[in-house]
Amino acid sequence: MQTPEQKLKQLNKTIETLWHGVSDTKDGDYPRIVNLYKEVLKINYKDRDAWENMIWLMWSLAVNNKDTSWLFEAEKYVKRYLSLLPNGYRSHEYIGQFYRTMYIDERLAVRHYESAIRYPDATPSTYHSLIALCIKIGDKVKARDYCVLALRRFKNDSYSLMRLKQLDAR
């Protein structure tokens, strides 16, 4: 009988072999890897890397196989990820990225990026994504406000300075 730690080690080694142990990652057995990540999460639901890798693989399967059922499955797991790990910028930032790039819903992406920047460990790139999204959806007032907010937190942030100058020039 394996301990949970031994089982996790075995699962992660198998994932590594199936995903990265092939000459081209496109040759990996993504559905099997997704199932292995589900097993990892049964043992340790706090493994943010497992959540994010599994969701990315589901999105990749949807794109590569032109099968939207994988995308719907990915969204289901995105919501579960947030419900189990709601605290911390990383969950919200990743989900903002999911809705920005994978399951396109820019307004929902903005909401999650806004949640992410409330945490003290939010990175400049989170602000950059939020600013770019606000500009893209035409909310220049919010974009400007987030530039100012980013500059308060990250003095001399070149991206925020550049965007602020562009927004003020309009």
State each model region's role:
Residues 28-35, 64-79, 102-115, 137-146:
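Structural signature of tandem alpha-helical TPR/SEL1-like repeats
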Residues 52-53, 90-94, 124-132, 145, ...:
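Alpha-solenoid helical repeat scaffolds
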